């Protein structure tokens, strides 16, 4: 510890302990950062991001992921390719996110644009998960139906917080990267806790029991809808709904025709689609193959929780070092690293790690940390870019549209990965061609580099759409619309309304 003596004006001196000062900065730095965001963006926005992303999606999502994998494998007893294809279906509600966005923007219920949808999302989530957890011998497709309903509940809650981030990114462009860092850190910390508990909980209460526990994060969503402050919209004419839907559709189509919008959107879809998802094949090999590690449930959860540290490191690295770099350069290097990181899975499948004296447990922990860190670094600049592509007036709906394109890419990736596992005959008991699936996936991850010309070269803090696309209003229109915007976006600022 270093101690320095500094002179005071009155001739005295004070001892400054640098070690303690640095430690205080490390501890107080994040607190000051959160206070700054709360001051600039309103405390309820920060609270909403932490609640929905940290608890509902981070903690609840990670628990649900592990529970779903074991539920499909041990309860429904499906093949890995079938499991991957079926679970991808549950993501369909995320593809139609623009519908939820339009509903919350233009269709108030009992005079409120946001509160009823939060309450509805929470109720749907609680009911669907209770049905899965309490029903014995539930048919596969009925279970899939209720999983899709719970996914829809999470998507409805998510779309409101989405719009808030998009709106604030436009009003505070210098804080766009900070907002994405907050979202990522909340999600990563929640996932860290969720994955850490997931294996233990699956072992203690089973996958169906975990579904029952997941009702609590959804109950929190309903509580958020009950307690947050939102201005009441008096005398709303429901005859306007059809016209507002039409206007929103025209505005989205007009914006999508702009090359500054459709080009990066196309790149995001291609990048996600070509990164073939073969997770279920690897998961079955980790847990069931005699030639594999044969990990227990607790071990799987612990490995995934440690892997979440990679996401936290990525969010921290992005916030401190990478948030000011150009979009195209970041996409180039993260995509290259993403392809190279997949080779770790190939080393594991060939069991080369054992030849170098590295046990499976240690190697997979390193693999998971590296994979999640690079995956998060690859994703964050795309999120920032997405938030900056949203025009005024339809921030929530258009952000939902762009994110639905990304979710469509993820679903396509899962389906293509499932098809590849099926073609290569990777089953519950046969894993002879799993190495080939991993190799093909790694090569496919390089192909998006051919489409980097679609990504803008601009800096993350200064990039913006042309004014004619952003839809700036005249002075009279601003005065006329200010009240309406305050009503429709107050929940974005005064509660937990959009990401």
UniProtKB/Swiss-Prot annotation:
Cited function: Could mediate folate transport.
Membrane topology: Multi-pass membrane protein
NCBIfam families: fbt
Recorded family membership: Belongs to the major facilitator superfamily. Folate-biopterin transporter (TC 2.A.71) family.
Coiled coil location: none
InterPro entries membership: BT1 (IPR039309), FBT (IPR004324), MFS_trans_sf (IPR036259)
Residues passing through the membrane, by range: 43-63, 92-112, 116-136, 141-161, 185-205, 209-229, 266-286, 302-322, 330-350, 354-374, 399-419, 435-455
Pfam family, one: BT1
Localization: Membrane
The protein's name in its UniProt record: Probable folate-biopterin transporter 2
UniProtKB keywords: Membrane, Transmembrane, Transmembrane helix, Transport
CDD domains xref list: MFS_FBT (cd17484)
Cellular component, GO annotation: membrane
């Amino acid at each position: 510890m270093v101690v320095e003596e500094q002179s005071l004006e009155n001739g005295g001196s004070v001892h400054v302990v640098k070690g303690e000062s640095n430690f205080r900065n490390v501890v107080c730095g994040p607190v000051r950062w959160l206070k700054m965001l709360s001051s600039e963006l309103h405390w309820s926005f920060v609270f909403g991001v932490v609640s929905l992303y940290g608890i509902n999606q981070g903690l609840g999502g990670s628990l649900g992921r592990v529970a779903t994998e074991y539920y499909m494998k041990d309860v429904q007893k499906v093949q890995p390719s079938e499991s991957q294809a079926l679970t991808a279906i549950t993501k369909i509600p995320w593809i139609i996110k623009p519908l939820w966005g339009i509903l919350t923007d233009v269709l108030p219920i009992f005079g409120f644009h946001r509160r009823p949808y939060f309450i509805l999302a929470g109720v749907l989530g609680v009911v669907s998960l209770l049905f899965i957890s309490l029903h014995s011998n539930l048919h596969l497709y009925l279970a899939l139906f209720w999983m899709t309903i719970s996914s829809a509940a999470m998507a409805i809650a998510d779309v409101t917080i989405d719009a808030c981030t998009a709106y604030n990114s436009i009003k505070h462009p210098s804080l766009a990267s900070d907002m994405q860092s907050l979202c990522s850190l909340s999600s990563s910390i929640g996932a860290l806790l969720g994955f850490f508990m997931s294996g233990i909980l699956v072992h203690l209460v089973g996958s169906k029991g975990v579904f029952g526990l997941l009702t609590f994060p959804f109950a929190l969503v309903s509580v958020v809808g009950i307690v947050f402050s939102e201005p009441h919209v008096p005398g709303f004419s429901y005859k306007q709904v059809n016209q507002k839907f039409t206007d929103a559709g025209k505005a989205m189509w007009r914006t999508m025709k702009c090359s500054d919008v459709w080009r990066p959107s196309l790149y995001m879809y291609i990048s996600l689609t070509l990164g073939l998802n073969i997770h279920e094949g690897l998961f079955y090999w980790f847990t069931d193959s005699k030639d594999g590690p044969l990990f227990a449930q607790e071990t799987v959860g612990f490995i995934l929780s440690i892997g979440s540290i990679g996401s936290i490191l990525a969010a921290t690295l992005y916030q401190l070092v990478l948030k000011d770099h150009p979009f195209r350069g970041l996409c180039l290097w993260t995509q290259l690293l993403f392809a190279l990181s997949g080779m770790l899975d190939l080393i594991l499948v060939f069991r080369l790690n054992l030849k170098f004296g590295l046990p499976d447990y240690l190697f997979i922990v390193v693999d998971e940390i590296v994979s999640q860190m690079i995956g998060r670094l690859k994703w964050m600049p795309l999120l920032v870019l997405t938030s900056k592509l949203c025009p005024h007036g339809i921030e929530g709906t258009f952000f939902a549209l762009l994110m639905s394109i990304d979710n469509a890419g993820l679903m396509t990736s899962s389906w293509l990965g499932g098809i590849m596992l099926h073609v290569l005959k990777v089953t519950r008991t046969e894993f002879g061609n799993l190495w080939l699936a991993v190799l093909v996936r790694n090569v496919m991850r390089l192909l998006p580099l051919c489409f980097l010309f679609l990504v803008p070269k601009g800096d993350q803090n200064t990039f913006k759409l042309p004014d004619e696309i952003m839809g700036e209003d005249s002075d009279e229109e601003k005065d006329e619309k200010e009240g309406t915007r305050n009503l429709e976006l107050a929940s974005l600022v005064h509660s937990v309304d959009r990401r």
